[in-house]
Amino acid sequence: MTVISPDATTTAGGPPPPAVSRRSRRRRGRVFDWMAIPAIVVLAGVIGYPMVRAIQLSFTNTNLLNSGGNKSVGFSNYHTLFTNDPIFWQSLDHTMVYTFVSVVAAGLIGLLLALATENLGGIWRVVRTMMLTPWGVPVVVVAFLFYYMFQDSGGVVNQALMNLGIIHTPILWLGNARWAMTSVIVANVWSTTPFFLLMFTAALASVPNEVVEAARVDRAGALSMLTRIKLPYLRTAAVLGTLLMVIQNFNNFPLIYSMTKGGPVNSTTTLVIYVYELAFDQFHLGFASAVGVIWLAILLVFAAVFIRLMKERVS
């Protein structure tokens, strides 16, 4: 038996590649650093400056309707928010409910659809592809679609429920504080479920066939196959998808505003809607900036905690 050593292979294939000196690597690294400067400048201008400016405005009483209103007020805006602004606390509560219910519902439905269509071929592949269609529909289009579906007179939802005998009189879905948030969440879940379906489908495709076959040889049941074999591979997709969807739902303005404009009676007013109303309806830029800073701080804390938990799980 002939044994081919690494040295022999290198010699037969030609002369070894020239060694790269430490100075060359350092020079190449500096070139890459200089190439990154334009991107850093653009990010600093597009993201950094507005963020710093918003923090500065949050400590002033800036109001576009008052030419003299640009004085420093310290932490007065924050004190008012926490102690004398019930709408802020309502909007924060609505944001949490909207985000939590939307992410959990869309994630569970996406997981069930991914598992149900995992091993199906033929026409079911086409069906699964069609399930991804809502993800490509613009948010404003989704908002107007469900806006007309939830109309009390002539809406598809009321007509279907009345034909099934579930209700006898039309429900004022978007004009009732009890049902408005539910209607908005349903529209959002329909729009974001395909994202989780795509994430979980890709994660299931990464499960090694050898592991699945070994589990079948050991006569693992469907539940054991799911909990012990597939779920560990789905964990990263679930964590990443949840983080991205929480950020998106926290910032979701066009869907809610197009359907309800935050009403009725502030029942669907979230933080992003409240900031918009303060800044562009009431022109209180200082107060709106204070809400925006708190909104950003909540997102940063959530992202930091979530990423740390993900790293601990991986380690």
Where are these regions (language model features)?
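Short, intrinsically disordered terminal tails adjacent to the first/last structured region
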Residues: M1-R22
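Short, Lys/Arg-rich N-terminal segment immediately upstream of the first membrane anchor
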Residues: P18-R30, R228
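A structural signal for multi-pass alpha-helical bundles of membrane permease subunits
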Residues: V31-S315
